[in-house]
Amino acid sequence: MTITELMLDIAAGDASEDDVHIQECLGHINISAREFAAAYSISEYPGDLPSIIVEAASNAKLPTNKGEAKEVANTAVIQGLSAFYNLMIATAKKVRASTERELRAYAALGKKYGINFDKQNFLTGFLNPLCKAVEKDGLLGKLDDRSFIKGKYAARMVENYGKGMANLMSGYGLSIDNVFGDSVVGLVVRNNYSGKKAIKDLRDVESNMSTGGKQLNFDKTLDKKTHYQDYVNIVDFKTLAISIFALSKISDSIIVTLGNASTKKTAMDNIKRLFNEASDGNKRVVRSVESISDGSKEWSDNLNKLTSNMTGALTDSSYELLKLLKKSKKSK
């Protein structure tokens, strides 16, 4: 693939089939949240339901019996969690596809200096020699505008994504802690991070997912003046490469862990079991169910925005690297 073809591949990579799946998941999550809110208001209504509420519920095809309304509310939350599970897969696939494109840009740079891309020994076998060659050659420098993500922000986005996804998945009793032991990932997601936590009841599900959802809330809109720069130095060049490679490993681990149909069935069966075991009248458990439904909208929004920001920032920056490489080839 030529440099021009690589640039076109990266530029065209903004929209994908994964975006369609992401929007479908977001739609299901929002519908489930609305269904829960309506059924929950009936199930928790103090005293007898007034005729106006009974009529409205009937028109909306909702039960007017409080016990049945509670079952509908719980089912809506379970369906929302199922859609959120699918959202985690769809966003991870979009992220992985992006990292594959961006790593090809670095591989193209390596080829220029006779350095083969080494996935097994990324740092010592590929990136460190590439950084030395690039710095010696004076390839990096000024850009036409602020189009290159600052290395520290790229790393922070990836760290937030890794931690956030680990905690979201722990709400389903699943873990990607094995990926945090990777030597490159450990440079970004630091201190041997673990998202694995015990799940005893729905309060644990809510707590873990709330933690993860908040960790994903990294600057929802990247600002060109704050997060980007109009030059590329060797530190940011290296930090971006490490961040992209770490992100590729994290997203791949998410897909492998979540992508098996039997894994989802087991996870959702456990969620259903927790709902069945939830004590009637336990206000803390009831509040957790409500918080899961309300929170899922915010968590899904954070995940979608961070996914878009990461893939967009990587696309912008990798495109600039290829432009520098193309200019370098023309000048020689």
Please report, for each region that a protein language model flagged, where it lies by residue.
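Intrinsically disordered, low-complexity terminal tails
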Residues: M1-Y85, L109, D118-F122, P129-K132
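Long, low-complexity or tandemly repetitive, helically biased scaffold regions used
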Residues: N65-A69, K112-K332
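Extended amphipathic alpha-helical scaffold segments
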Residues: I78-A105
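Charged, long alpha-helical segments
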Residues: S98, L109-K112
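Membrane-engaging insertion elements
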Residues: E102-L109, S328
